[in-house]
Regions:
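Nucleic-acid substrate recognition interfaces
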Residues: 1-423
Length: 423
């Protein structure tokens, strides 16, 4: 690709998707101390810039600073956070946002850390296969073509850092076609229920994610329940040392263990999500799927009330992350990806073509765990019924649903296959 053609394509950012290559920097890594030092300085710069912006907000005489002409990326992030704050205020005034809106807050003076962004002109790519951050000793191996790299970020993650190499990829042209479709319903026991008009349903097992969550919750609760054998009123010769040195040290160790638990949990869930979505993408490409419709209700994790045990699992599963993974993989494969609202899709009967909305009485009902009975007494998988209704609801809303497509979906709604991807 010539520079002239490349410049013309990159001018339109809608053709571009930015991806990351991640490198984990643990506490034992040779670059950990330097990453920590840089992140601490970024935090100080963030707080200093935030102070100026907050003063301009409270005091009309102080000029509001716009950092778009400043090359310092950290200061631009502060400016971005304030613009987001004002945008949310505007939405709230129109009734489009119902959650509290607060000013950006200062980061903790000692424990606080902040992202360190390096634009392309602040990194060196002279050594083939390596990215070096300017004025540091940090040099990271990379498989990315140096012409595609647009920057690097050092991201604090509690007990470790992630160095992200950012690179741009040109998205293939996506043609909207509803002749070969797939519908995805996210859930708990079945992480994703996938239906289509060209292949039989696939149920991706969600129990590995539940077990990861339960183990993390169990271990974290144990750590929170730990109590020191020393008590503040204990009569001892070294009482001052116990209160001033040993107590804080024990609390610090407990916090490190807790951060380690949640960090490991997050990494394991990310790994499983990537494996599941990659497996699904291979299946979609194999069957030449043109459009994927995935169900999701905005705020569903915050508004549900399914009991303590279910909430512990459901609320902690990052479905938004699962959706974003599948979305960018579909974009790279040239598949049209749509996220659709899914209310009442599990209550209405797909076989009976029941209108997907609230009814006093429904044509079908769930008779036992995992099964849905239609008005004709036919038993089908409940998640398959919900998945098919997600696609039907969206396609009907845009006028692309036909009797021919409905009959195709009926032919392929039987014999669902359950898949468990190894962790």
């Amino acid at each position: 690709m010539t520079k002239k053609v490349k410049k013309r394509i990159y001018k339109n950012r809608s053709n571009i998707i930015t991806l990351t290559e991640r490198h984990v920097i643990s506490e034992s890594h040779v670059f950990f101390d330097e990453c920590d030092r840089l992140s601490l300085k970024a935090k100080n710069l963030y707080n200093a810039t935030l102070y100026v912006q907050r003063q301009s907000f409270f005091n009309p005489d102080v000029k509001f600073v716009n950092y778009y002409d400043v090359t310092k990326q950290v200061q631009m992030l502060v400016d971005k956070s304030f613009k987001s704050y004002f945008a949310l205020l505007k939405k709230k005034s129109k009734g489009e946002y119902d959650k509290p809106v607060k000013l950006p807050r200062y980061l903790d003076k000692t424990k606080g850390r902040f992202v360190v962004p390096y634009p392309k002109d602040a990194i060196s790519l002279k050594t083939a296969g390596f990215v070096k951050l300017s004025k540091t000793d940090i040099s990271i191996p990379t498989r990315i073509d140096k012409d595609l790299i647009v920057g690097v970020r050092i991201v604090p993650k509690g007990n470790h850092y992630i160095i992200e190499v950012l690179y741009d990829v040109v998205k293939p042209t996506i043609e909207v076609d509803y002749s070969r479709v797939a519908f995805v319903d996210p859930g708990l026991n079945n992480l994703m229920t996938v239906t289509s008009n060209v292949f039989n349903p696939i149920l991706y097992n969600g129990k590995p994610v539940k077990s990861i969550n339960q183990l993390a919750n169990k271990n974290a609760s144990k750590r929170q329940g730990l109590r020191s054998p020393w008590k503040p009123n204990t009569k001892t010769k070294n009482k001052d040392r116990v209160q001033q040195v040993i107590f804080p040290r024990l609390e610090s160790d407990k916090s490190k263990l807790t951060r380690s638990i949640w960090s490991k949990r997050s990494n394991r869930i990310n790994d499983y999500f990537h494996k599941v979505t990659t497996n699904l993408m291979n299946h979609l490409v194999l069957h030449d799927i043109k459009t994927v419709v995935m169900g999701h209700n905005v705020g569903q994790k915050q508004d549900i009330n399914l009991g303590n045990f279910t909430n512990q699992n459901f609320v902690n599963i990052p479905f938004t992350k699962l959706i974003s993974m599948l979305e960018y993989k579909c974009q790279l494969a040239g598949i049209n990806f749509v996220v659709s609202e899914e209310s009442y899709t599990s209550l209405c009967s797909f076989v009976d073509k029941e209108d997907i909305c609230k009814h006093k009485e429904y044509f079908g009902n769930r008779v036992e765990r995992g099964l849905f009975r239609t008005s004709l007494g036919v038993l089908i998988n409940a998640d398959v019924n919900g998945s098919l209704n997600i696609g039907r609801k969206y396609l009907e809303s845009i006028g692309e649903y036909s009797n021919e497509l409905h009959n195709q979906l009926l032919n392929y709604m039987v014999n669902p296959k359950k898949l468990t991807i190894s962790i």
